[in-house]
Amino acid sequence: ACGSAGAGNLHPGDAYLSLGTTAWIATVTEKPVIDPQQRLFNIMNLDGLTSSVYGTMQAAGASVNWVRELLGVGLEEMNRLAAEVDPGCEGLVYLPYLDGARSPIFDAQASGVFAGVNQIHKNGHFCRAVFEGVAYALRQIADAQREFLPLTRVHAIGGGMKSTLWSQIIADVTRLELQ
C-alpha cells in the first residue's frame, strides 16, 4: 500500500509497474477485484476506501542479474548486446521463473527455461531473451488485469527502468504507456 501511494497511485484507475529484483503491476480500484482464476490479489490502500489489484513475478531484475553474472557483463554491455539482436531473438525464448511463478500462474516449483537454443545464438540473444521473457511475463499480468479494468498507462518505477531498451521492450510487449 505504501509503495502504491509513493508511486502516485491515489485514484481508481491509477496504475504502476515496479521493475526491480521482482516486478509487479498494481492498479487502484474502488472495490477489490475478485478473479475466479485466482491470478491476482488485492491490498487495501492507505485511504481505507480503495484497494489495489496486484499481479506479481518473482525474478525480473533477478533474471537480468543472473544472466549478467553468467556472461560476465555489466548492465551497459548487456544492453548493447541485446540491442544488436532483432525482436524475437531468432527463436530463443526465456521463461523467467528462477524463483517459481506468482501471477498469473502460482507455481512455487516453476523454474527458468531457455527454449529454442541453437548454434546461431550468441550472448546478445540470451541478453535480449531475458529482457523479452520478463516483458512477456508482465504482459500476462497486464492481460489478466485487463479482464477486469482498463489498463493502458502505468507509472514505471524501479531500477529496471534505467535501461531504455528494456523499458521499450516492456512497453511494446505489454502495450502499456510507461510514464
Please identify what each model-predicted range represents:
Residues A1-Q179:
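Active-site core segments that coordinate phosphate-bearing ligands/cofactors
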